[in-house]
Design a protein with these regions (language model features):
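Short, surface-exposed amphipathic charged segments that create phosphate/polyanion-binding patches used
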Residues: 91-94, 207-211
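C-terminal substrate-binding/active-site "lid" region of AdoMet-derived donor-dependent transferases
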Residues: 150-210
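Class I SAM-dependent methyltransferase Rossmann-like catalytic core
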Residues: 1-47, 57-70
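The AdoMet/dcAdoMet-binding core of the Class I SAM-like
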Residues: 42-138, 152-159, 188, 197-200
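Glycine-rich, N-terminal phosphate-binding loop of Rossmann-like dinucleotide-binding domains
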Residues: 144
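Glycine-/small-residue-rich active-site loops that bind phosphorylated ligands and cofactors
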Residues: 56, 147, 173
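A conserved beta-strand element that flanks and buttresses the S-adenosyl-L-methionine
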Residues: 141
Length: 211
């Protein structure tokens, strides 16, 4: 794998098999904050419970943890990752208030980990196969590799599974605006809308409907 610097100065990795980077060239930190943290309104939630598909380099978690640390609220975070990266790869600095807590967390992975700031769990495996808790999440970060190279992670069966893991009214955010992904989200029980992006393409948000 090859390290690359994104436009906001934060690093990402290029995956040679998927032939994609873990983050957009416009900015790893920018996407984590604008799309996932703010797009799901997790930055306003009094006790967020986040489910992430595609933990990757942990940037979304680190940005979310910084937000909860600064606000003095507890974070419950469950991540799914098919190909977890080594600790020494994940331990890069981002200049965030959460850097120290993240380094301490790495020593205890895969966990689960209880800490003064909250709770973290990492499910290692294919999202189609791992068992997810029902009615857990106030927010879902849907961030696997793209539908073009990793369509299985975006299938209807997976999205129905995510809906069951979501609380009613939970917010889902993803960078993909592919038509078939949006249709699958609707079929799975999410109200779908476009989310403005500072870059060329809009993102996608969903709200978990009552069943």
């Amino acid at each position: 794998m090859e390290w690359r610097k994104t436009a906001d100065g934060s690093p990402t990795l290029y995956h040679p098999i998927y032939q994609e980077a873990y983050h957009p060239w416009q900015g790893a930190l920018s996407q984590a904050r604008l799309l996932y943290l703010e797009g799901t309104r997790t930055h306003l939630h009094p006790s967020p419970r986040v489910l992430e598909v595609g933990f990757g380099l942990g940037v979304n978690f680190r940005v979310t943890l910084e937000s909860t640390l600064q606000r003095g609220v507890r974070l419950f975070y469950l991540a799914v990752e098919k190909e977890p990266l080594p600790r020494e790869v994940l331990a890069f600095p981002l200049g965030l208030a959460s850097d120290g807590a993240f380094l301490a967390l790495l020593e205890k992975l895969p966990g689960p980990v209880e800490a003064p700031w909250g709770w973290f769990g990492l499910l290692v495996g294919d999202v189609r196969e791992v068992e997810l808790p029902e009615a857990f999440a106030s927010a879902i970060y849907l961030d696997p590799f793209s539908p073009r190279v990793n369509p299985e992670a975006w299938g209807l069966e997976v999205l129905q599974k995510l809906r069951k893991a979501a609380l009613p009214g939970a917010r889902l955010a993803t960078y993909s605006a592919a038509g078939w992904v949006r249709r699958n989200l609707e079929a799975a029980g999410f109200r779908v809308e476009s989310l403005p992006s500072p870059w060329k393409r809009a993102w996608t948000a969903g709200t978990a409907l009552e069943t």
